[in-house]
Amino acid sequence: SQVFRRYTEGKKGWKRPLLFVQFAGVAFICGLMYVVMLQYYYVLNKDLGYNPKRVVVANTGFGNKENQDYALTFFRGLPYVESVSSADSHPVYSYSGTMIQDESGQSLFSSRFCEMMEDYPKMMGMVMKEGRMPRNENEVAINETYGEWMHWGTELLNRTVYNSGYVCKVVGVIKDFRIGNFTNPQAPFILMSTKNFGNCVHVRLKEPFAENLQKLNKVSADAFPDKTVDFRS
């Protein structure tokens, strides 16, 4: 009997470390899941500096000014469209780069840049901190980070931007917004104005979102059969 008891207790002995390892593993996995949930919550609630809700985009061009005006009027007239505008790209896709120089032509740094229609920042919920939108090719708006990189202090308006051979006047300052994903550091940014509608068309839909997106793609295919107009979120 005593031999059997010692044998049984011996068999139980090796289970205790195993049980500890199992509990430690479960605790580690739970902790990891908690961290992931916190990161997910952070991403969902992080201020992007613009409002992407119910915004869909399609990359397409409409040719001459008459066709552009027709397309813009068409999209604005759809009952399930809240607002529409266009730009070179969407913030999450990032933007092209341009080299910034000083007065002597010495390269300073690379800045992101984008051409936008005048109503685009308002449509996207971007904030113009001071000044106004550019109105011609000799004017630009910059973000806060651009001013910081240039060491301009708080006086940003009426400064001169030397942009890859172009000499432009700063007429507006836009609040920093997220360019690319959350792993990308905040980049300097130049905003230029365009009157052309197309390239990256942005549409903010009304609810119900999924149903209205299907409607939008259907009527777009019918209205522009010679083009690929595929809106996506």
Enumerate the language-model features and the residues they cover.
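"Rare, low-scoring activations can occur
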Residues: 66, 70-83, 144-148, 164-233
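Alpha-helical transmembrane segments of integral membrane proteins
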Residues: 1-61
